[in-house]
Amino acid sequence: MNTAEVRKIVTRALSDATGAGWKVYSPRTLPVMPDQYPLVIVSVQSEHKVSQGRHVPQYTTTTTLRIDGRVLAYASGDDTESAAGVAWEEAEAMKEALERAIIGNPDVRMKFQQIADIRAHIGVDSEGEGHAGIVVLELDLEYYQGPEDFFPSEIVPLREVNVRGVHPPLHLHFD
């Protein structure tokens, strides 16, 4: 496993389990059109490897993954609730959905030794036409990397095995 695989695993899980659906992005694919909100951007912040001993490349690796969620809210005609308040509440709801999609997903949890740390930040940006609710999650995902991750195997896969017996003749073919 490596950091690109970590990002892909989490991106896939978020696409499947949040209200953002297919609108989960990796860096540099962020749309600018308002009709494409809510959206989620997944990027790798950093990676830290701690050696498990001398001579053999075995590491406990921690990848810090950053998940940026964005929602957009506009002021309604009545004064019952402000767009900034709606954006904040939607950002809070998105934070909960993002955490459930990762922590509650056994396919994600089984790939890692642990989710060592989660940091969450919520805010509202009111500079544009609407109010953007912003949630930032930073997750420290810990996993093992060993020789198999650094020295790829060049073994040719087994395609056919011929087995001969006395009665009856037997041929096995693997596809």
What are the residue ranges of the model-derived segments?
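Charged, amphipathic alpha-helical segments and their flanking helix caps
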Residues: 1-25, 47-175
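Short acidic low-complexity segments
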Residues: 26-34
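A short, hydrophobic beta-strand-centered structural micro-motif
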Residues: 35-50
